[in-house]
């Protein structure tokens, strides 16, 4: 239909939007996740969407972030002495997002060091598994690979590709 024929719709191109939604479809087996928008946003060309997209997984997160940032100078200009307190909400959102990014970065590094291509494996993990993988050593990951059919399948399907 017309969706595919328009180059851009509300700032998004059709191919990017469809790829984004396909990633959501791939993760439907998992319960609500703190990474609901992280994986779909990784396909976007815009760095901002790749980096900040996960903030939009829940409606209240961008409201807390942007609302707090917008309200603070207004309250300061109005002479309210507690204007700085309103910045606590944006700081909490930023700190939580930083923590989530650090966990997924650690999990990706651990998987890469153990010989896995990290993004396809992480896409197929629940939050609990991602958090656990972020804390595992190479030896612990090797033990999982040796004892778990699921991890063996990860190793078979998603090894790090070596250049020839």
What does each of the following model-derived ranges do?
Residues 13-29:
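Active-site recognition of the HExxH zinc-binding catalytic motif
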Residues 7, 47, 58, 144-145, ...:
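Context-gated lysine
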Residues 8, 25-29, 70:
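Residues at structural and domain junctions
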Residues 80-164:
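Pan-zinc metallopeptidase signature
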Residues 68-85:
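Juxtamembrane "helix exit" motif at the C-terminal ends of alpha-helical transmembrane segments
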Residues 30-71:
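Post-HExxH zinc-binding segment in Zn-dependent metallohydrolases
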Residues 1-11:
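Active-site scaffold of zinc-dependent metalloenzymes
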